[in-house]
Amino acid sequence: MPAEFPDFRLGNVLATSFTATLTERHGDAVERIPTPQRLVDWLAVNGLAVDSCTTAQLELARELRESIHAAATATAIQDALPASAVQVINDCSIQGRAAAILTPEGNRQWRLSSASCVEDALGVIAADAISI
């Protein structure tokens, strides 16, 4: 990964790791997926490898990321979930066609419908957000 980009902040939960691709939201924001290729890199690190990403797909990913952040924040402060965030999360989950497979080692692995389907990867992230 190029040195000019900040390191990814990875955790054990896919959806919250995804929200960590933008940090310092209330200060000098640090964008960790500033380009489509950087989103491809992040997805690969998280087991959701795709061949490429368009600018429109990057924008959809950022919209999903901020929707997950808004829903998680509302949950943390025991507020109502923002309807627009719920809609984006649900839409991304519905549009994705990834399948969970069991590896010989007994682990879950995601199989995307094609290596070019960022929407499948976003569907996995959205489903993870729904589960938490």
Residue ranges and their predicted role:
Residues 1-132:
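Short helix-coil boundary/hinge micro-motifs
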